[in-house]
Amino acid sequence: MATTPKTTTLKTIALASKPAAKPKAAKEAEARLQQARRASILLKHVSDPTRLQVILSLAEGERHVGALCEHLSQSQPAVSHHLALLRHGGIISPRRAGKNNFYSLTDIGSELAKVVNGLMA
């Protein structure tokens, strides 16, 4: 019984294992899903009234933690917790000056402040 030689090469295996290219509509749908996921994460960061107050306060200008504690009538650990969540979400950015941490809104934070102000009007 004669055997036929295998003509499979590494190139053929590599080509066969590549996933088929996605159609344009599927790529666009995937991009929209990723945008929705990013928006969902962002909205989770601002889903707390205290964090919204922090954003609105920082929309008026940079503040240090002590000023935010006084403005919010909350303890420093509580305010620091909210600031950490907002910082992690890319909504605020810190600046160290001596022993004080000053916080300000990022571009995303500024846009969120405008939206929140519009909703509260």
Features from the language model and the residues they span:
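Short, functional N-terminal and low-complexity linear motifs
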Residues: 20-23, 77-83
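N-terminal helix-turn-helix DNA-binding core of bacterial DNA-binding proteins
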Residues: 33, 37-77, 97, 101-108
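Alpha-helical residues within the helix-turn-helix
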Residues: 70, 81, 87-88
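N-terminal leader segment of winged-helix/HTH proteins
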Residues: 1-46, 111, 117
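C-terminal edge and immediately downstream basic/flexible tail or linker adjoining helix-turn-helix-like DNA-binding
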Residues: 104, 113-121
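Solvent-exposed, charged/polar functional surfaces in cytosolic regulatory/catalytic domains
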Residues: 49, 86, 115
